A protein has these predicted regions:
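Short helix/turn-capping signatures at newly exposed starts of structured segments
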Residues: 1-109, 114-144
């Protein structure tokens, strides 16, 4: 089983490098887009979304809370919010990371935290970006 923790996004180590492999993620994903560049795993309380570029390089991993679901099969990838990031308000995050918001986003190195109604909506991890700009942020509904 692969475990992704919030703290993984904020360390030099990052997430398990095996999850950079599109072929592996395809074998554990619950759903995927038509072109298979967007793959998602639905764990009990979180959706874990992997976005790959056309050359199969991991572009980002996105985590968002979902309505708790009943597990129909054993899961192979899990997200643990060990920083309770999804329980924090916009002001909590600004204070914790000493950052300001731009267009409902706070960026910290390879991480972009997106807010809706001053609550954390989603957490993005861009493994190959030294720093994120808002032009790199795409919603999950964006065409590939």
């Amino acid at each position: 089983m692969y475990i992704i923790k919030t703290t993984d996004f904020f360390t030099d180590k990052g997430i398990n490098k095996a999850l950079y492999d599109k072929t592996l993620v395809q074998t554990i994903a619950d759903v995927w887009s038509e072109n298979q560049n967007l793959l998602a795993i639905y764990h009990t309380h979180y959706k874990i979304e992997f976005s790959f570029t056309k050359n199969n390089t991991l572009h980002y991993v996105m985590i968002e809370e979902i309505t708790p679901q009943e597990q129909k099969q054993p899961f192979q990838c899990e997200f643990i919010d060990d920083m309770d990031i999804f329980k924090k308000s916009l002001n909590d995050i600004k204070t914790l990371f000493k950052r300001t918001t731009t267009d409902n986003n706070i960026t910290i190195d390879e991480v972009l935290i997106h807010f809706e109604d001053e609550k954390v909506d989603s957490l993005y991890y861009f493994p190959y970006s030294a720093s994120i700009t808002n032009t790199e942020f795409r919603t999950t509904n964006a065409p590939q």
